[in-house]
């Protein structure tokens, strides 16, 4: 599974040049060249593949295209570190990276800076994909990246433990914490709730979901910061008070996706906010999960009712400085195809972008969360659509982490964040 720091927010940043190709995938520097031409070896640059299936997909391509082989270059699990390395490669105009597996929030930034090329819409089955995911690959209505996986936050919960105390899946934060209190009292050593609370993109996602789920906005539709409000404070207080009263364990403040997944699979959590990829791993029957068959998923809870997820996912784009762009386009077509998306869903439980897969009876039976996930993606909120997204995200992380750590109050953290965001969104 690729790191998600996988998303209720979108991005806003940029265009293109291209390349005539030779037979090697390159590694030297050089400016952007020509059109979508050139066939030969290419690279796929991606975050750490914790799903274990990406190489299988690439192997399938390589077997059928021995003269156009794809080499996977894995970057760190941390999304911010991934972006940093991709940006460094782009700013040096290196041709070492061909196809970039971009978090949806980076598409606009890379397009605006002319680090990725515009792609021909007619070459891809965009009408078969979830419309919300297609929009994440566009910049000023032009296609720069193709969505291969989507994401929406889900609430994983221990169904067996809730059943034992007569609790139902919660729709509000109060219901979730009330159920926790009953379960934890009967199961010493089990913690109530965790998400992605380390200071990285995942915290931006979790903070934004909390604010949105309280009825607020981080950045409004007019592009203006909107965090110094009662609703935003209610969202942040949900996280801050959870830490204070122990319902969010202290160590959970260091969790990214994988740390939380391991804790949930070890039976340490009652509730876990996580992406769809966790489902297959947590339900594994090979002895790696202590909760297989004991959990279920539900929509994220909110302050007064069901909450709002952040729109996540990954898009494939082509570096402006790469060689063999024609091969890159053909490889993206292969990866976005229904056959590959179906196989990836069945192997990893990652959310597909191919809309029809969410309604197939056999898949819904195997992955009961698909119906709710589709609704989550369709209703998910984008991340702040601002040009300086990375700076905005860093400011959000600093404010949320400092409040959750008890270094500052929610009110002061949000007042300071409002000032910073106003400067960044001018």
Each predicted region: which residue ranges?
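Hinge/lid segment of periplasmic solute-binding proteins
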Residues: 104-152, 203-206, 292-296, 362-366, ...
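A structural signal for short loop-to-beta-strand junctions that line the ligand-binding cleft
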Residues: 88, 96-98, 126-161, 191, ...
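Conserved N-terminal structural module of periplasmic/extracytoplasmic solute-binding proteins
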Residues: 2-16, 20-108, 123, 286-289, ...
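Conserved C-terminal helix/tail region of periplasmic/extracytoplasmic solute-binding proteins
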Residues: 163-164, 185, 375-426
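Long, aromatic- and glycine/proline-rich binding clefts that accommodate carbohydrate-like moieties
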Residues: 132, 136-137, 295-298, 345-395
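Extracytoplasmic/periplasmic solute-binding protein
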Residues: 144-148, 153, 174-226, 240, ...
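Glycine-centered hinge/linker elements that transmit conformational signals in sensory
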Residues: 180-182, 186, 224-253, 300
């Amino acid at each position: 599974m690729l790191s998600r720091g996988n998303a209720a927010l979108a991005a806003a940043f940029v265009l293109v040049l291209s390349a005539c190709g030779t037979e090697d995938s390159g590694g030297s520097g050089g400016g952007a060249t020509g059109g979508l031409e050139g066939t030969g070896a290419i690279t796929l640059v991606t975050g750490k593949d914790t799903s274990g299936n990406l190489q299988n997909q690439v192997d399938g391509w390589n077997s059928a295209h021995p003269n156009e082989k794809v080499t996977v270059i894995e970057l760190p699990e941390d999304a911010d570190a991934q972006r940093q390395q991709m940006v460094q490669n782009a700013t040096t105009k290196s041709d070492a990276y061909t196809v970039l597996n971009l978090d949806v929030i980076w598409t606009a930034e890379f397009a605006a800076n002319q680090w990725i090329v515009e792609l021909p819409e007619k070459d891809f089955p965009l009408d078969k994909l979830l419309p919300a995911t297609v929009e994440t690959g566009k910049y000023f209505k032009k296609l720069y990246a193709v969505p291969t996986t989507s994401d929406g936050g889900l609430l994983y919960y221990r169904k067996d433990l809730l059943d034992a105390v007569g609790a139902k899946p919660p729709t509000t934060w109060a219901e979730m914490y009330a159920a926790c209190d009953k379960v934890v009292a009967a199961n010493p050593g089990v913690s109530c709730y965790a998400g992605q609370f380390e200071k990285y993109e995942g915290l931006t996602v979790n903070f934004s979901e909390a604010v949105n789920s309280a009825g607020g906005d981080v950045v409004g539709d007019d592009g203006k910061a909107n965090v110094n409000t009662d609703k935003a404070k209610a969202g942040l207080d949900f996280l801050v008070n959870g830490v204070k009263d122990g319902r969010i364990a202290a160590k959970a403040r260091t969790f990214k996706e994988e740390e939380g997944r391991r804790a949930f699979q070890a039976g340490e959590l009652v509730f876990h906010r996580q992406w769809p990829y966790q489902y297959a791993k947590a339900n594994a029957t090979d002895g790696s999960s202590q909760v297989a068959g004991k959990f279920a998923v539900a929509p994220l809870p909110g302050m007064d009712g069901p909450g709002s997820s952040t729109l996540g996912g990954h898009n494939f784009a082509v570096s402006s400085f790469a060689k063999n762009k024609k091969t890159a386009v053909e490889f993206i077509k292969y990866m976005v195809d229904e056959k590959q998306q179906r196989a990836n869903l069945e192997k990893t439980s990652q959310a597909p972008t191919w809309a029809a897969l969410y309604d197939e009876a056999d898949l819904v039976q195997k992955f009961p969360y698909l119906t709710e996930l589709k609704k989550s993606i369709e209703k998910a909120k984008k991340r702040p659509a601002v040009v300086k997204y990375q700076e905005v995200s860093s400011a959000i992380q600093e404010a949320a982490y400092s409040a959750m750590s008890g270094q500052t109050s929610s009110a002061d953290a949000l007042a300071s964040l409002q000032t910073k965001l106003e400067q960044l969104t001018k």
